[in-house]
Amino acid sequence: MSKLLKLTGFTTLSTLLGVSYYYYVIDRPLYQQTALHKTNVQVENIIDNKAQFQYEHMSRDSQAVVQRPFAETVKDIWNKEVRNTADWLYSWGK
């Protein structure tokens, strides 16, 4: 019975490994969609000087406007108020 169990386990494991290998290496779409493959292609393009980077050109005029998310603005206001309150509380001890 134990030989049959070992044979069944070995057969199941080797079948799973074979199917995984087939779908991951031979039938490539699963591999080509992974982050590992995409990173590998990007690194190869950088090494071969084929990479295309998107550049953002900054304007040189003095009227450049910086946009920030509303959440960041609220955080800054909150932090300023907390600092002012803490300074006011500590000023009592001076």
From Swiss-Prot:
It is a single-pass membrane protein. Pfam families: AIM5 (PF17050). Signal peptide: none annotated. InterPro entries: Mic12. Component of the mitochondrial contact site and cristae organizing system (MICOS) complex. Belongs to the MICOS complex subunit Mic12 family. This is MICOS complex subunit MIC12. It comes from Kluyveromyces lactis (strain ATCC 8585 / CBS 2359 / DSM 70799 / NBRC 1267 / NRRL Y-1140 / WM37).
